[in-house]
Amino acid sequence: NYKCIDYEVGIDRSTVMSWNLIAESSPSIMYMLVGDDAEFITKNWDQIFLDQYKKYPDGIFMIGTATGKQHGLIHKTSPHPVITKEWRNALGYFWPVQFHHWCLDNYTNDLATRINRYIFLEDVMIKVKKITEDNTAKRIRTDAVNKRDQWVYEKTKQCYFEYDVAKLIKACSK
């Protein structure tokens, strides 16, 4: 019962802008930050995701999964977080609009952890092969880009984090 989602190849813009535009046009109830290089290893991963609504019927939660990297399992990091439509509606965005590409997963993880709504599914494996040799990969992985996005992350945490936490907590109590 899934509807195909149209996509557009167009002007050069931040990936975050593109992801938000896609989410805003989609009737989906969950959104995942992941590219076309992902390999979904675990069978029925989609149903496992949907089953998390039983834990939080208000829909305010974030899902993280195993990626095949030991660091991620130890620290329960989620470079490919999954959020819900309710989460997006509460915050007003899919991913924080001020980010260009990197660090928005950290910010989202921080929010979910802060409100105690981070579900880490270590038995669900989604492996991603990082493509690092093409022109786009080289352009977005420079030291300057990393410093820019780290600065945006720190400023966003400083200026907006408590506000975003309050919006999510308010949505939890509805």
Regions from the PLM with identified roles:
Residues 43-62:
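Conserved donor-nucleotide/metal-binding helix-loop-beta segment in metal-dependent transferases, i.e.
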Residues 28, 79-92:
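Conserved nucleotide-sugar donor-binding
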Residues 38-41, 107:
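A short, conserved beta-strand element in the Rossmann-like catalytic core
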Residues 19-30:
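Active-site nucleotide-sugar/metal-binding loop of Leloir-type enzymes
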Residues 1-10:
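Acidic donor-binding segment of Leloir-type glycosyltransferases
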Residues 100-102, 106-174:
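C-terminal catalytic/acceptor-binding lobe
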Residues 28-39:
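Short beta-strand-to-loop acidic/aromatic patch adjacent to the donor-nucleotide binding site
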Residues 61-79:
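Short beta-strand-to-loop element that shapes/binds the nucleotide-sugar donor at the catalytic cleft/hinge
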